[in-house]
A protein has these predicted regions:
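C-terminal His-loop and adjacent cap/lid subdomain of alpha/beta-hydrolase
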Residues: 1-497
Length: 497
């Protein structure tokens, strides 16, 4: 089916008001994939509706196209806008509020009325968009308060991938997220990607996310937590490689990096379900207990000086971080082909764009390129013979350590949503293992059958419990979460009937 009208800002957000000339001279193109030629839509064939919001100087702007929108098609609207709102105040507010609560200062009398206990340590936790904000928060120097003190002792960006966000620039759009299929070249996923210093191959500039904090002696402890899905759809390798993707980056001593294998952007409940937005059923792996456990480890690190578990993430040096494709063909170290499963040709890689001389100093876009031929190189975790991630180079949930399926870190868009060669947004996939050798041979499936891996359901449960206990012993999982994971395993008894 075709949609008739779309909010150009997406997700119900407000847009920037077109000028009179911008409304009259707006241009619209369409194409199915990023590298396809842009096909102009005649101005008489599309309309912009500006709906005033009484409590904001930002309106809703709706776009309609004669004949409707085609599923999966990329529509690119360009118009002159006015009245940018103040951006970046949110990060200043976070800095000032946390500083006030922590140190008192001028707000001491008001704070005393709240009856709060003294604050000895502070940790910031941000999921997805909020994780990108925390990377920006550190890069822009907001971990130093107005009196030169450290605001957060610990910062935990979770599933942020390699990006920042449009949180602190003119004409900011904080929720807009760059992806493999859509939202290309918005100023989100930008150098520097790493917490330690690296050099941008396209400009020669050297920088780091923690550069300003290091200069002011306000560097926090950092835990960067992400899933294997971020490597495919959010440039997840760039925070721990050089921008060329040829060498591992050196992690500063204050930084730990945890890549949770066999998982998608959002934690699941462990139970498989039917395919929806992707060609494969959605990856159900439950990883939230691991991230929550690491939050406690962060507290112990900053408050009790107890070392957290060591970083665990795939690396170029040991061969566990690899190209998804070699010479345009599937890299067998990243995926062993399965009959009936289409492997993506696509992989998200942030593109470099020159936004003009004022971007670095003032965050003002004077030039907005529509195309680029310069890309930072992204890599993906290597897989084993069952196409699952490794327990030695990722923090691997027990469902994948002791598998009944391949927990795929990517998915392709469902055919009925169009552009089926592109990656589905922020989701992975799930492919059950063959039950027996006969089933594997019949399906030409090279993966190990369940019957060859486990002699019985009890054997499966025993191995699964051992995997859970290993995560607990190594410090990646709290004992209190073991029961949750074991309940999922016990629900798989039907597989062994």
């Amino acid at each position: 089916s075709t949609a008739e009208k779309l909010n150009i800002a997406g997700n119900g957000h407000l847009a920037y008001e077109p000028t009179a000339a911008g409304l009259a001279n707006a241009s619209l193109t369409r194409r199915l994939y990023q590298d396809d030629p842009r096909l102009p839509v005649e101005r008489s064939q599309f309309q912009l509706e500006v709906v005033v919001e009484n409590d904001s100087n930002q309106p809703i702007v709706n776009l309609s196209v004669a004949g409707g929108f085609q599923p999966g098609m990329l529509y690119e609207l360009v118009y002159e806008a006015r009245n940018p709102v103040l951006a970046g105040a949110g990060m200043a507010a976070i800095r000032d509020m946390v500083s006030a609560i922590r140190f008192g200062d001028d707000a001491a009398d008001e704070l005393s009325q709240l009856g709060l206990s003294d604050i000895e340590s502070t940790v910031a936790w941000g999921n997805s968009q909020s994780g990108r904000l925390l990377r920006q928060f550190m890069f822009d120097g907001f971990n130093e308060d107005l009196n030169g003190r450290k605001v957060f002792d610990g910062v935990i960006p979770v599933i942020a991938g390699g990006g920042f966000g449009m949180f602190n620039n003119r004409f900011a759009m904080p929720t807009r997220t760059n992806g493999q299929h859509s939202n290309h070249l918005y100023p989100n996923d930008l150098f520097p990607f790493t917490y330690g210093e690296s050099t941008d191959p396209f400009t020669g500039r050297t920088d780091s996310i923690l550069g300003k904090a290091r200069a002011s002696s306000t560097v926090p402890k950092v835990m960067h937590i992400q899933t294997s899905n971020e490597y495919w759809v959010r440039g997840g390798s760039l925070p721990h490689t050089n921008p060329q993707g040829t060498e591992d980056a050196v992690l500063p001593e204050e930084v730990r990096f945890y890549s949770i294998g066999g998982s998608q952007h959002g934690s699941g409940n462990g139970l498989p379900s039917a395919a929806t937005s992707g060609q494969l059923p959605r990856n159900p792996n439950m990883w939230a207990p691991i991230a929550d456990s690491l939050l406690v480890a962060m507290y112990d690190w900053i408050a009790n000086d107890k070392a957290p578990p060591p970083s665990r993430y795939p690396q170029i040096a040991d061969g566990s971080l690899v190209p998804a494709h070699i010479d345009g063909r599937i890299n067998s170290r990243a995926w062993n082909q399965l009959s009936g499963v289409t492997h993506p040709d696509a992989l998200y890689a942030p593109g470099f764009a020159n936004y003009g001389d004022r971007w670095i100093t003032d965050r003002i876009v004077d030039i907005h390129p529509l195309t680029t031929d310069m890309y930072y190189r992204t890599l993906v975790p290597a897989v084993n013979s069952n196409n699952n991630d490794s327990a030695t180079t990722t923090v691997l949930p027990p469902l994948t350590q002791v598998p009944l399926a391949t927990f795929v870190p990517w998915n392709l868009r469902a055919v009925n949503t169009g552009a089926e060669k592109s990656l589905a947004r922020l989701v992975g996939g799930y492919i059950p293992l063959p039950a027996s050798m006969g089933a594997a041979e019949q399906a030409s499936d090279p993966r190990t059958p369940i019957a060859a891996m486990y002699s019985s359901f009890s054997d499966y449960l025993s191995l699964y419990e051992s995997a859970s206990d290993s995560l607990i012993r190594e410090g990646y999982l709290l004992q209190g979460f073991k029961q949750t994971y074991m309940d999922i395993a016990r629900s798989n008894d039907f597989v062994f009937d």
